């Protein structure tokens, strides 16, 4: 086998449609566009979501809710994620160094999901009641 002899398998590639090249091609004259109308014209067509003048769905439905800007700087951390952090003292900088949270995160909260297998000291993070109990039962402590 040589690079200059490689070719696609037989029947794997289809010839492109050549529209407007005579009636024998099956796509002559109107080229598969039908007669007249906006979609038959060059550059013709309607925008996405256009329903022919009827009030479109995206305008019939009400607006609701918003995205809190706090959510971009806040993270939830599972107890199982603490396994990725080196050292016994875990704070926001340690979480960032271990790539558990992104660099833009300013606040983090530990939640009870998974389990912690070693005694760790949590410093400067928010902790749920369940996570607090799990950390303390593993011999760890929480410093505010």
From Swiss-Prot:
**GO CC annotation: what is one?**
cytosolic large ribosomal subunit
Assembly notes: Part of the 50S ribosomal subunit.
Per the UniProt entry, what species is this protein from, by scientific name?
Answer: Proteus mirabilis (strain HI4320)
Region feature (Disordered) = 1-53
Q: Which GO terms describe its biological process?
A: translation
Molecular function (Gene Ontology), one example: rRNA binding
The name of this protein is Large ribosomal subunit protein uL15
Keywords of the record, alphabetical order, are: Ribonucleoprotein, Ribosomal protein, RNA-binding, rRNA-binding
Q: What does this protein do?
A: Binds to the 23S rRNA.
Similarity remark = Belongs to the universal ribosomal protein uL15 family.
UniProt feature, compositional bias: Gly residues: 21-31
Instruction: Look up the domain of life of the source.
Output: Bacteria
């Amino acid at each position: 086998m040589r690079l200059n002899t490689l070719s696609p398998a037989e029947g794997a590639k289809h010839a492109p449609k050549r529209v407007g090249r005579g009636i024998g091609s099956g796509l002559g004259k109107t080229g598969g566009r039908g007669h007249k109308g906006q979609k038959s014209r060059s550059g013709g067509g309607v925008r996405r979501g256009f329903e022919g003048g009827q009030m479109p769905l995206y305008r019939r439905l009400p607006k609701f809710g918003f995205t809190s800007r706090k959510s971009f700087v806040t993270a939830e951390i599972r107890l199982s994620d603490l396994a990725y952090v080196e050292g016994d003292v875990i704070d926001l900088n340690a979480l960032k160094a271990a790539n558990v949270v992104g660099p833009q995160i300013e606040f983090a909260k530990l939640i009870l999901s998974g389990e912690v297998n070693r005694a760790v000291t949590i410093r400067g993070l928010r902790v749920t009641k369940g996570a607090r109990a799990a950390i303390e039962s593993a011999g760890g402590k929480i410093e505010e």
